[in-house]
Structure formats: structure tokens, C-alpha cells
Amino acid sequence: MAMVVSAWRDPQEELAAVDDQSAAGREHLQHRHSPKSAEEKAQIAAQNQQHVECVVCGDKSSGKHYGQFTCEGCKSFFKRSVRRNLSYTCRANRNCPVDQHHRNQCQYCRLKKCLKVGMRREAVQRGRMPPNQPNPSHYALTNGDHLNGQCYLSGYISLLLRAEPYPASRYGNQCMQSGNIMGIENICELAARLLFSAVEWARNIPFFPDLQITDQVSLLRLTWSELFVLNAAQSSMPLHVAPLLAAAGLHASPMSADRVVAFMDHIRFFQEQVEKLKALQVDSAEYSCAKAIVLFTSDACGLSDIPHIEGLQEKSQCALEEYVRSQYPNQPTRFGKLLLRLPALRMVSSSVIEQLFFVRLVGKTPIETLIRDMLLSGSSFNWPYMPIQ
């Protein structure tokens, strides 16, 4: 599934790329005309900089931003807070811990610490922009913003795509060979990767990391199975019935005839949703937008800011619509067909997906519990499988 990417570049990313190339050129010239001792000093300095911690949360710093060494997360949080002139409220005593594991729990205390350690508001306001470039706040991703700019939409989609930890083309060629029936272990391995990919993707897309941690948990606990189905379709996951039943352990714990019939119906429905998505030949950008539409749902229980979540879903839907209109002008019904496929994903039984793919991996531990633990830990979950090379 190919995607035309040349027309979908974030202008700010292009500017950054030009700056990076210029910097690389300067560094190359310096290396050519400097003595070896200078090269060694530069290497030592670079190694030391790699270990600089974010002064806000203690995570690994990506460089100096707005006057202080910070990670990408705190840099983005501070920039958004200042540019939108946001005000937050602390639900505790205005002294919440702000570290790598708790930085998303209280935005008030996080911004307070950003300012306390010396991050400068004025550095955000005068952030560099190319000549004749509209103010980035014009494309600020806030409720009630301007949604008509292609730059805004292409930038949003680019960030969704960049958040993918495992591109579909790298899901293991040994598992994707047509005509070969996957073994039980391969099925469980691929399923673990698909679920891991969904959670890691969510943690790295715009806006989701800035939500209250309780909202993050609620959204993923409700939608993980829908994201799994989308990833299964995108990766062309083979869904042969026999190994699926074996992976589910039905032979070890026999079911009654009625339960077997119901279980098979759920499997067939799951297979149908995957096949219908594959038949539409959905490309990577469309899958990313579809996953964002699914993830940002106001149907999750206990959300702290439902209008904000609804706004994020609307943005994702607008981005998908504009992308389809631009990339598939000869398919006027394509956007509608894609959108109509999403409600059925909610009807795929999450308990059946657990039984089919994860009971051998995690036993009786609910997937929702694993997702919660992964988000609360703030670090990658250690699946018992090697990462894709």
C-alpha cells in the first residue's frame, strides 16, 4: 500500500531539515580543517551531551529548548501552553511530582516547574519562522482552530505516521508469506507486536501524551481491540481458523457446542472486518487517521474533558477527509467507505481477541491491566519476543 509522501511535508519539518543539513555541512568542514585533538574533544562533548537530563522531568534531554535542556515532551508541552496561553488547575496542593513517570498527571505543576527551572516564555513567542511563513498559531491544534490549511493537515498526518513504532512493511516477512499457515507461536508473536504497536503509537501521537493519565488509560482500555483490528488489517495478518483455534487453547479446555458456535461466529466477524479493510486498499496515512478517529472517542468512561476529546476526533476526521480528497480525487466515495468501516470495529469482541491471541502470552491477566501498567510505568512494556529488525 503505497502513499504519495512528496506532497505531504510539514513546512516546519522542511525548515528543520535544511537547518540540519547546513549544520552537517559546517561540521564536515570543521572536521576537515581541524586537528585530530579537536575531533576528539568534539566527540567527548557530544557524548557528554547525550547524558544530559531534562531539567523538568529527568528524562533524556534532546537539546536546549527555550533556555534549558529538556526532553521533546516537555519542550512541546511548554510551547503549546505558551502559544495557546493555556491556564491549568491543580487538583491537589500545587506541589505534584513532575518526573518521567508523573509528568502527564498534572499540567499545572508541570508548567509551574518549566517556569521555575528557567524556561522562557519570550523564547517561544519569537520562535524562528521562515520569511512569509504564517504564524504557527494559525495552525495551532486547538478546539475552534483553522482546519483548512493543507500545511496543518499534512503536518498532523506526518506526526501520526512518524509515531508508528513498526512500519507495516517490517512486520516480519516470515509471517507474511502467502500460502503458508502460521504456527501458533508466530501467531502469538505477531499479535503481541500488533498490540504493542498500537499502545506505543498512541503514546507518541500529538495530544494523547498531554491528556490526563486517567484519560489515556480510559481511551486505550476501550479502544485497544479496535486498534488491534486495524493493525491486523494493515499488516495483512493471516487469519486461518485452525491455528487460531489451537492458539485459543480450545482443545485443552473444551467448550459446549453452543459456545463453540458462538465463538466461531465471533472469529468469522473478526475475519470479515479485516478482509473488508484490506479490500479497500487502505494506505498508511489513512490507517493512521482511522486509528486516531477510533482512539479519540468520547464514549470512554470517566473522561475529564469530553469536548476536548471530541475536538481531537473531529480534527482526525477532517485530516482524513482532506487527505483522501487530495490523494484519491477519482474516488469521491472513498472517505465515506472508510468512515463507515469504523463502527463495526467496536463490535469485534475484545474477549475473543484475548482468547485467540493472548491467553498463551499473559494467562488470565486482562489486556486492559497490561495497558494500564504500560502507561503508568512511562516505559516500554517488555514482551517476551525480540523486536522486529
UniProtKB/Swiss-Prot annotation:
Residues 51-126 bind DNA. One of its GO terms (cellular component) is nucleus. Gene3D superfamilies: Erythroid Transcription Factor GATA-1, subunit A, Retinoid X Receptor. Pfam families: Hormone_recep, zf-C4. Keywords: DNA-binding, Metal-binding, Nucleus, Receptor, Transcription, Transcription regulation, Zinc, Zinc-finger. Disulfide bonds: none annotated. GO terms for molecular function: nuclear receptor activity; RNA polymerase II cis-regulatory region sequence-specific DNA binding; zinc ion binding. Residues 19-39 are annotated as: Disordered. It comes from the Eukaryota. A zinc finger (NR C4-type) spans 54-74, 90-109. InterPro entries: NHR-like_dom_sf (IPR035500), Nucl_hrmn_rcpt_lig-bd (IPR000536), Nuclear_hormone_rcpt_NR2 (IPR050274), Nuclear_hrmn_rcpt (IPR001723), Znf_hrmn_rcpt (IPR001628), Znf_NHR/GATA (IPR013088). GO terms for biological process: angioblast cell migration; brain segmentation; cell differentiation; cranial skeletal system development; negative regulation of transcription by RNA polymerase II; nervous system development; vasculature development; venous blood vessel development. PANTHER family: NUCLEAR HORMONE RECEPTOR (PTHR24083). Putative transcription factor that is required in photoreceptor cells precursors during eye development. Belongs to the nuclear hormone receptor family. NR2 subfamily. This is Nuclear receptor subfamily 2 group F member 1-B. It comes from Danio rerio (Zebrafish). The gene is nr2f1b.
